[in-house]
Structure formats: C-alpha cells, structure tokens
UniProtKB/Swiss-Prot annotation:
It is found in: Nucleus; Cytoplasm. Keywords: Antiviral defense, Cytoplasm, Hydrolase, Metal-binding, Nucleus, Zinc. This is DNA dC->dU-editing enzyme APOBEC-3Ca. Its EC number is 3.5.4.38. The gene is APOBEC3CA. Belongs to the cytidine and deoxycytidylate deaminase family.
Amino acid sequence: MEPWRPSPRNPMDRIDPNTFRFHFPNLLYASGRKLCYLCFQVETEDYFSCDDSDRGVFRNKVHPWARCHAEQCFLSWFRDQYPYRDEYYNVTWFLSWSPCPTCAEEVVEFLEEYRNLTLSIFTSRLYYFWDPNYQEGLCKLWDAGVQLDIMSCDDFKHCWDNFVDHKGMRFQRRNLLKDYDFLAAELQEILR
C-alpha cells in the first residue's frame, strides 16, 4: 500500500464520556475541537438488527506523515472487513463533524462500488457550512442517496448507550442540543 494512502486499522470499541461530551455537542462554532469521531454500525442483510451489527468508533489521524480522516479510516476498514460488494449492507454513522468535500467525494465513489449499501449519516455539527465547497459535498452525498441529518436527542442517547464507555452513568442531554434547530434548518437549506 502507498504510504500516503490511509491504512486500515481496527476501530475503538467505545470512547470516554468526557470525550463524547466535549466533541459531540451541536455547536455552531466549536473551537478546540479539531478531532472528528465517527461512531458506526454495520448491519448485513441477514442481521438487519442492532443486536447483531458490527460497531465501533474511528477518530481521524492527525500525524503529518499519515493524515487520515475518520471517514477514510472507516472506508478502508470496511473494504477489508466486507469485500463482497454484491451483499446488502445498512450502515449508520454518527459523526462529530460533517464530511469535508474530499471525504464526501470518496464516500460517493465508495457507494458506487457497494451498490447494495445504504448509508445514513447523523452529524453533530456542520463543518464549514458557509463554504460552497462543503455545501456541494453534502449535496453530492444527498444526491447519491445518503440520508443526512443533524443528531437529535435520540441519536445522542443511542451513541451514549452503544459507543461511550459510560460505566453505568446515566445519559444527560445537557448542552448537547445547544444549536440543533439552527443546524437542522441550515442542513435542510443546503440540501434544498
């Protein structure tokens, strides 16, 4: 494999509660949050239920010599784990940031490879939502059949229950939905 290409790695099982609370709130401007987390679940045709799905968490790699966005980490991992392109897959992502234009393009190409895969993306925040290039990337995903939405309270609770190492702590929605209404309206406007 070329050294500049993302290499597959194993996803994390869960993330720390403080990491979740810091990186996932619906915020317009999230200073200091340079990492992107991607929580995923993969359901195959035989197991279209959450109980039997493959799930985990990817985080972007920020090393200058081996940069890899969380979406790229997932795509590389998925191709290794699920080489059969004619099977049916239902994939759900919960992202702390929406995809950049490059990742959006790579996801569209990935969906052309896996024609029987449905992808739903629930994102906490919109990355550079005012930039036309980022808007175009989201539109390309939408046009490719990707379900796109801003994470709701139910989505946050699902992530807490399935992707956070909460050690029995109860889910608290405090501050997670701060700018939900604005972000949801902005996404709808972009996709119109």
